[in-house]
């Protein structure tokens, strides 16, 4: 029997320090291109939207939420399969140092969350063809992802669109894997025969 993917609402929460590009990442993905050509001179805002996408030739709805600690606490329906993007900018060591803070806030609400650590603004990593000083390297991102028990470390740039779609494709894959796993477990639980507690033992007369 083919599953009805139209009923799935994939929830992706985007967190991180101010200025790391959370709204830009959401806008770039929903628009399907780099922001340099699509949103020149416009002010980008994003809070909580639902968008329709096609993933692996299946129509899906995504709820994309940008939030802080208070926003997370207000959202009552956070589920086991929801995905959290902890974002930091590779040109901001301060935002990198605050990753642990965001990880802690998420785990206060959900002890075993699905986290992808995302390094943004990778187009700013090099200046004049040379690696900038005091920049967060890919190796540092990978190591930090291991420290916070993230599922994966990924990087992107909304100026070039590099890696943006891949971040959300991976988020959807994680969500769907967990969602279908839970559904299959529930189905199997109905198939397990229940023990007959009313069965009487045979007694010798």
From Swiss-Prot:
Localization terms from the record: Cell membrane
UniProtKB keywords: Cell membrane, GTP-binding, Lipoprotein, Membrane, Methylation, Nucleotide-binding, Prenylation
Gene3D superfamilies cross-referenced by the UniProt entry: P-loop containing nucleotide triphosphate hydrolases
UniProt signal peptide: none
Prosegment location in residue numbers: 203-205
PROSITE patterns listed in its UniProt record: RHO
Modified residues (Cysteine methyl ester): 202
Keyword Cell membrane attached: yes
Binding site for GTP: 16-23, 66-69, 120-123
Placement of sequence motif Effector region: 39-47
InterPro entries listed in its UniProt record: P-loop_NTPase, Small_GTPase, Small_GTPase_Rho
Residues lipid-modified (S-geranylgeranyl cysteine): 202
Assigned protein family: Belongs to the small GTPase superfamily. Rho family.
Protein name: Rho-related protein racJ
């Amino acid at each position: 029997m083919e599953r009805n993917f139209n009923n799935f609402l994939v929830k992706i929460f985007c967190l991180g320090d101010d200025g790391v590009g959370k709204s830009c990442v959401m806008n770039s993905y929903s628009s399907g291109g780099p922001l340099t050509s699509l949103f020149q001179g416009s002010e980008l805002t994003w809070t909580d939207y639902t968008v329709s996408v096609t993933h692996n030739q299946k129509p899906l709805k995504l709820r994309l939420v940008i939030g802080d600690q208070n926003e997370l606490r207000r959202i009552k329906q956070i589920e086991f399969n929801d995905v959290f993007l902890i974002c930091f900018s590779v040109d901001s060591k301060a935002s990198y140092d605050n990753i642990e803070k965001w990880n802690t806030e998420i785990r206060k609400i959900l002890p075993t969350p699905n986290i992808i650590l995302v390094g943004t603004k990778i187009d700013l990593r090099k200046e004049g063809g040379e690696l900038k000083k005091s920049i967060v390297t890919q190796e540092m991102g990978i190591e930090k992802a291991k420290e916070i028990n993230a599922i994966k470390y990924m990087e992107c740039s909304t100026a070039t669109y590099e890696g943006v779609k891949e971040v959300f494709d991976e988020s959807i894959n994680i969500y769907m894997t967990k969602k279908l796993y839970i559904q299959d477990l529930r189905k199997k639980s109905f198939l397990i025969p229940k023990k007959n507690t009313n069965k009487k033992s045979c007694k010798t007369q």
